[in-house]
Amino acid sequence: MKWVKSGVGILGILLTICHAVTSQGHILDITDSLKITFKTLSNFGPRAQSIQNVTIENVGIKDIPDSGWRCYFCHDQLLFPGTFNLARNQYFLRPILDNYVVLSDGFLLEFIKGCMYRITPIPRNAPIKTRDKREFTLLAEQFSVSKYDSFPKWYCETISGGNTEVGIIRNTENLKYVEDFDSSYNWFRIPHDFRSVPLQPQDRFSANHKASSVDECKYKVIPTPVKASVSKVQRNFGTTVYYGTTDTSIRGREKLFKVAEQLALKHNLGLVEITPGLTVNNGISLVVTGNYVERNIPSPDEAYSLTVTADLISIEAPALPGLINGIETIHSLSAWDMALPYGGIKDFPRFPFRGIFLDIASNFPGYNYIKKFLTVMAQYKLNKLVLPMYNNEGFRLQLNDSPRYEFQALHMIGGKRCHDLKEEKCLFSQLGSGPDSSGGYLTKAQMTDLIKTADLLNIEIIMSMNIGESARGAIVPLKQSPHSRLLYDPDDTDFVDRFYPQKDTSMNPCREETTYFYDHMLKQLKDIYNAASVPLKTIMIGSKVNFDQVLNSKYCYASNLNSTQRLMARGNLERNINGFKLNFTKRLVKTAHDNGIKEVMAIDDVFTTEFDAEGNTPNTVYDTKNSDNSTRFNATVTAVHSRYDTVRDERLWKRGDRFAELGYKVILSPPILDFNYAVEPDPDRPGDYDSVIRNISFSKLFRFVPDSRCCNIPNAIQHDCALESDCTTAGAKDSYIGTLGKLDTRKLRSLKDWNELLFPRLLIFAERSWHKSSWEDSFGPHRASVNNITRQLITNYTVPNWNDINNEESKVLGCISRKEKLRLMHEDGLKPYVEPPGARLLGGNTMRIAASTTEDSFWVQASVNGNPWTDNVKILDVNPTDSVRLRTVHPAKAELRSKEVKLNLTSLPTPRERFRKIAQDALSRRIGIDIQRARMPPMPVNPAYRPPVPLPSFDPADDRAPDLAAIAAAHPPPLPPGMPSHMMPNMPPPFPPRPPFGPPMLPPGQMRALGQQAGQALRGQGTALGPQTGQQPMPAQPRGPLTGQAAGTGVAGQTGQQPSTAGQGTQQGLPGQQRGGVLPGQWPFFPGMPAAQFPPMFNPQMQRALQMRGQGQIPQRTQGAAAGAGQSRIPQQAG
């Protein structure tokens, strides 16, 4: 199927006029005069999750003509998602015209490619006069709760005589054109979503914060050593670095010399090799002993011992990696005052693999940043850096493919983005890159230098390739190369990814060109590694095959088949799709092995099956042994376990142990290690989110427990741990070799944003990956039992050792603030995230403010009415009419500061406190209902009967212990089928406070343009959003299970859309991730929470619908009738 544009009749003539644009003014007259304002009105709109308003204003001195120009912008979510054909995987914007949406105020909207859309003024409308405004509304697929969901650099073009001029609309250079998120309409992802409400200073205030002292942090090493004993007596570095080794190889001795030389140069010391009879004193002794005292540890090569006495600073290790770790420890000990304390340290890591996946493909940070990042990784003893060569947004490595230069176009075209619709010179603009050439790539010389640098820091650089989906950065450039073998066939069926709607994003595994490309890339990488004198040991496969493409590609079948034979062959292939997938995976591993690569890493989806008729599921893992017990893969295979969601009741967090049982090495990479998640729910700060995880705080990351495979599961029953029946622990512990943190950079346009999300969370990740704390064993699965008398299900919650957790967390995070953030700024030039201050009003006759900060050694500064900042504020007198702004700042580094926050001088609860109270009320009502039901006799035939939930003691706002009922309050479930009316509590539903203004309303003209009609607000239809205009009452749901449908939200036209669950982030090609999105008719799954087992009181609209049905106000209809009213039947889809 091809993309279709109407070319007949009046509509075709209109489009022809629109595209035959001629310049009626210089581009700057348009881009300097236009002002764009973007506002998310509500995340609860009809037919889509988000209603967004765009205002175009002429702020110039000239009128803007009604034609001759058009503008481009990036929107990462599908606009008008009703035009996406899920069954055929096609995306047409055609409510009125093929491939177009007619917007209000005289504009056409069309989809271009990737995230790019184009708006064109309809000719013969009035020009946009000075100070005139035009507005139109967009319907987006998902909710939007952050300014970083929008992209900068909207730009326009004019065409005159074949010459194109382009320019960026000036006020969209940054995100200031996006208006504030200021109410529950655009804070909430779903009703009662109080965790998404931005924090106010009152929410952050901590009256009893225990600050760490200088003495506690001065010699604190992060990550924490296994054994350490130091005193307050100090000494300097001495005069000489002595080095020696038992390694007789030339490479081993040369590498030790370079390591010792770097240490000597850094501290301006002499350098002497240890020889027999040499007296070693007054300096630093570095000795590789070759003596493995402890072999029963995870990574004996990285063990070391450090001894500091009056005579000598001695570091001994069995191998050079351990010696390098010891050197980083003396750097940490001496960071405060360039002196070392007397004492000793014995240390080794808990995992041999401690890595970071740094997405340099989506947005390229530059060679210098990557080199600096290697230095920071070494400081905190991280030893693996995974770099993607390419994804959909770019190709980032120059290859040495002379003399044919077969793949030269990869970096020349794929390494930059610009306004080139034909993509002959660059990839088309994406992700707010604008019309001018932007991006970059690593040259061969730069890549060689990075590999050398990393090797001296005990870091292995692992390159990741997407041999399957998310490969557009490699596919498109090769179309323009006269010598290359194309990875793209224009005759392929037009099946596209609904989260990246264009078809040339996946390599076809049935074509020999794909295997040739993969083999050539491996050879090129091997040449680069050889130039650095470092062996290429590991490669990573970063995406899986697109099976829609496989089933519809002519290359996957014999060429001489007629239509009937082709249909039969397709059925056979579909039944044997997992055999096809296994053979392709084996071919990838064998090709790597043939190129001398000993280990192949891959996302977990590569080594698991798809659903099929034989009962295979995504939890079915390919065995590393064949049926005759021979080895299936001829290289070491390592699975990156990153999927922790649920697909058709398959708990994918169980995969890890299945991998371990069947002979894989396993790397843990759960969603809690995704650094692209926001630090806190702040719409103004960078960071992503999904339907389950709004943010990953420092505390939450600190409580990551790698050894507990039943925990680290987003929104599990309590403290992210599941029921024992929902997890397995049979996998061999030794098979778990490490952890992998990830940074997806799709929405991060500046290095400032990168640093804010990475630091200091990278340090906390390093702490958990290197050091195992004693309290970690207190985490574990919850156990369920049945009361033999009442037959009620009882859950016995495992309670972690919160006292020890809080004490250690306070020390580690306190020393990160007091010491490590200064190191990042002073030694590395990186500005980490600084938490804003807290404050509250004190009681009494005068208005006084108490301020606090959790950042040890930092000050709180205050500015009243715009006056200069006051330092170190703890108590401040103010007047009721004052405007007070606060920020956290380091007294020695003024640039190390937080964002400014405004304090509302009111004693009323903050929005977060109000919404928390709503959830608490919901919990109380839920508990009350369950207590009543507990007194009733068991009624197994009654589908509405449920056993009570125990009463755990917790704070619903505390992310360490999310409770079943609090989660239910935040995520309203569908209507339980067949709920008897006498079981419904006669009580009002727990509404959130209504915003101070009415719900966003579409003008009738806009509603007609969108194919909608203004309806009547029905009595009893009020919700957290207020009465919704344009909505009709929802027909009653039939008894029995629904087919692939979540309950509607009380309005016609709602398709029950919710985004995917945690672990499905926003970047294809990252370990185990797919772009998070909406599947119509689905609700996100939460472990241990069958949706039909919650009372509809948690869904106000369901409660109202039931009451109205009981009063005869809503007639009961069949499923077919409901579909006719706007609720189309949609097959069940994987989450």
Swiss-Prot record:
In this chain, composition skew of type Low complexity spans 1004-1026, 1043-1073
E.C. designation(s): 3.2.1.52
What processes does the entry annotate via GO biological process terms?
A: carbohydrate metabolic process; chitin catabolic process; glycosaminoglycan metabolic process
Q: Where is the composition biased (Pro residues)?
A: 986-1003
* Domain of life of the organism encoding this protein: Eukaryota
GO MF annotation terms: beta-N-acetylhexosaminidase activity; polysaccharide binding
- From the UniProt record, give the pathway where this protein acts: Glycan degradation; chitin degradation
Q: Where is this region: Disordered?
A: 970-1082, 1107-1135
**Where is the protein situated, by its record's location annotation?**
Secreted
Enzyme class, broadest EC rank: hydrolase
UniProt key word Hydrolase = yes
Q: Which residues form the signal peptide?
A: 1-23
Q: What is its main location?
A: secreted
Q: In which tissues is it expressed?
A: Prismatic layer of shell (at protein level). Expressed primarily in the mantle with highest level in the mantle edge and lower level in the mantle pallium.
Q: Which reaction does it catalyse?
A: Hydrolysis of terminal non-reducing N-acetyl-D-hexosamine residues in N-acetyl-beta-D-hexosaminides
Task: Spell out the family assignment given in the record's similarity comment.
Answer: Belongs to the glycosyl hydrolase 20 family.
Name of the protein: Putative beta-hexosaminidase
Q: Which organism is it from?
A: Margaritifera margaritifera
